[in-house]
């Protein structure tokens, strides 16, 4: 029985010059200043993917003032669903639309099927990681008034989606300013038939290959983190992840392990262990925190014009 407690592990170890810049930089709150909760709008887009060879839908939560502020560009949070779920889960099983209404940012919820958000080991039509980075994100930037730069982009998710989000933050630091996870399945590349038995095993092998495969190694968040150089670490986004103390060991233990490696590597992050399990009640509660931190780390909306890419 794991002890019920709340733990926050937070570490900031940037060079002094960077710390001073952050200390004296102006803040850009994304929260609505009116005090009342505005009404957001939700759209569903059908995107034809060449990399997955399928039409993949995604939902978009637009800020309340998106239609009226014709020249404003907004930061974007990409919110990934879990295994066995779909793009609609966040909207139908949590109150994320209500929570997002407090912030002036766009929230995109893509379809990831059971892909683990990786480019699969078998088949040319399982390139979901490439789809997210090379097709989905450009499509969102084309359709909506987004801030098309690192400081205007974040990624987060639950379970399978939490794994994908943290991995993207580690692999693509120039793309995201924040990466967050709730109940992240970080140990997935170690899974055997014991964890993914029955009908799930064969599809899982097509994605990751057998234990020790190159695909598993390339998508192992522990190995990716251990291999980071000091220079690479300095470029990383801010990380947040949490896990319920009543979650299964296959989720809880890897979360604590990953935070330990982050501490060893001096990677700024926040890790929390909170009462709860692998459930929608827990995820509905914690997505509020993900939105709050994402809003803190992203740049505020800005008037349209020349967008600086950095």
Functional labels for PLM-detected ranges:
Residues 1-10:
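N-terminal secretory signal peptides that target proteins for export/translocation
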Residues 6, 28-30:
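Compositionally biased, low-complexity segments
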Residues 7, 19-20, 266:
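Generic short N-terminal amphipathic or hydrophobic helices
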Residues 12-27:
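Bacterial N-terminal signal peptides
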Residues 31-310:
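Non-catalytic cap/lid and distal C-terminal segments of serine-dependent acyl enzymes
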């Amino acid at each position: 029985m794991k002890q019920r407690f709340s733990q926050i592990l937070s570490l900031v170890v940037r060079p002094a010059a960077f710390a001073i810049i952050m200390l004296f930089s102006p803040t850009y709150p994304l929260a609505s200043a009116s005090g009342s909760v505005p009404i957001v709008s939700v759209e569903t887009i059908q995107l034809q993917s060449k990399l997955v060879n399928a039409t993949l839908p995604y939902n978009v939560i637009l800020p309340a003032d998106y239609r009226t502020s014709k020249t404003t560009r907004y930061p974007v949070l990409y919110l990934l669903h879990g295994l066995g779920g779909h793009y609609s889960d966040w909207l139908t099983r949590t109150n994320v639309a209500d929570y997002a209404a407090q912030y002036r940012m766009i929230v995109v919820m893509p379809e990831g099927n059971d892909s683990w958000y990786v480019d699969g080991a078998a088949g040319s039509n399982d390139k979901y990681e490439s789809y997210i980075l090379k097709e989905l994100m450009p499509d969102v930037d084309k359709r909506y008034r987004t801030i098309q730069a690192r400081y205007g982009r974040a990624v987060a998710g639950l379970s399978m989606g939490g794994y994908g989000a943290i991995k993207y933050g580690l692999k693509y630091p120039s793309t995201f300013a924040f990466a967050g996870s709730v109940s992240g399945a970080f140990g997935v590349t170690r899974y055997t038939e014991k964890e993914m038995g029955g009908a799930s095993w064969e599809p899982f092998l097509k994605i990751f290959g057998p234990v020790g495969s190159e695909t598993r190694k390339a998508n192992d968040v522990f190995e990716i983190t251990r291999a980071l150089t000091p220079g690479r670490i300095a470029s990383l986004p801010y990380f947040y992840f949490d896990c319920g103390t009543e979650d299964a060991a296959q989720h809880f233990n890897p979360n604590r392990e990953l935070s330990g490696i982050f501490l060893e590597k001096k990677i700024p992050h926040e890790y929390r262990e909170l009462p709860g399990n692998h459930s929608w009640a827990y995820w509905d509660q914690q997505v509020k925190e993900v939105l709050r931190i994402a809003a803190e780390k992203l740049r505020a909306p800005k008037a349209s014009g020349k967008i600086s890419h950095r």
